[in-house]
Each structure stands twice: as structure tokens, then as C-alpha cells.
Amino acid sequence: KDYVEARRLSGAAAAKGHIEAQTLLGHMHLHGEGGEKDLPEARKMHGLAALQGHAGAQVALGTMHFIGSGGPIDFTESRRWYGLAAAQGQADAQANLGQMHVYGQGGPINYGAARRLLGLSVAQGQADAQVMLGKMHFNGEGGPTDVVEARRLLELAAAQDHAGVRAALEVVNKASDERRAKETSDADAMMALLLAEDTEEKKKGAAKSKKNKKKGGAKSTSPPSATPPTSGGGGASA
């Protein structure tokens, strides 16, 4: 690859307003390809292409504003450019904007918007979005806690060798094991309670039956009253 020649040709085309050339030249200035790094010039070139609607340039410009590359950090501008690229279906922009909604960078926290954007990015296989959305499901942010879905998403990211996802997956797996143990313990406790209640009811029934039997037996075996018969004559004979 002849980066020097590519940089020269891109510069000539970019000066004529060619959107792809502006984007490429911005990339080359950003990474020092074909010459020295020039971060302010990279920001300028990406800005020109972004204004013409180039989604890749919009993402790059959003990131430069986010980290303060080639100029000051500006979360509001970062969020704006990510938003424009995300609206074009750019997966990285959707993931980055989703995370900004989670942390309230460049605007208020909005978990609902974050879940929606991250979901769109996940559908395109974006690993960062898989991790972030997995964490949201685990923490119950923007919806109910769903450890099963959290694990599924983190495993998708792990399959792409996403850095750091293993630690998050260990936490989720541990929580899943603890939840299953608790559910088993709760089920066992409930069963024990039901058995105890059933045993108690049986004891009460047996005691009541025994008491009734005692009452019935006493009535049938009691001796008749021994009232002496009266004599029809006078006194007893001598």
C-alpha cells in the first residue's frame, strides 16, 4: 500500500468536496497513514464528510468529540453526531449512543432509549452493544431483571472474544447459580411447610376422632340408676 500517494490523491479529491475522499483523508490524518498524525485536520475532514451525511465520518467525529481527539471533549456534540449516524442504521453509532443514554453523557439518562438503540445494534452483531445490553438486563435497567437474557447476550459477545466480557459472565453465572439455589431452597421450604401443615391437620383429625369415640363409649356402658323398689305392704315382717 502506498499511503503517501493515497493521502495526496485523497487530499486533491477532498478539496473538491468528494465525501469518500474527505472521510479517507480524515482517517489517514487520524492514524498517521501516509504522513504525520494531524488530529485537528482529521476532525476537520471528518466534519466535512459528516455534514454531507457520511455515517462513518459521523461516527468518527462523534468519537473524536467524545474522547477529546483533535479538540476539546464535547459530549453534546458527540451525542449529536452519533445520533445522526444511528438514524442511518450504523451499528457502532447505535451502540455508542446507547451507552451515552445509560450514563447520561451529553444529555439525561434514558434507559428506554438505551435499550432500543442497543437492541438495534445487537441485531447487527455489535459486541459492545451485546455486553452493555446484557448488563442492563442483569441490573434491571429500563426493564425487568432478566438473568437468562443477560447471560445469552454476554455469551454472544464472548464468542466474539470481546475484551473483559469473561468477568461479567462470571458474575452473571454466579448470580444464576445463587438464584437457582434460592429457588430450590424456597421450594423445599414451601414443601416442608405444606407437609407440616398436612401432618398437623392429620393429628388434629385423629385427636378429634379419639375424643368422639370416648364420648360414645361412656354413654353405652354406664350402669342404670339403682333406685330401690317401693313395697306395696306396710313395714317389713319380723
Predicted regions and their residues:
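Intrinsically disordered, low-complexity polybasic segments
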Residues: 200-221
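Primarily low-complexity, compositionally biased regions used by nucleic-acid-associated proteins
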Residues: 167-203
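Hydrophobic face of amphipathic alpha-helices that form TPR/SEL1-like repeat modules
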Residues: 24-31, 60-67, 96-103, 132-139, ...
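Short helix-capping/linker turns of helical repeat alpha-solenoids
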Residues: 16-18, 31-33, 52-54, 67-69, ...
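Intrinsically disordered, low-complexity regulatory segments in nuclear proteins
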Residues: 220-238
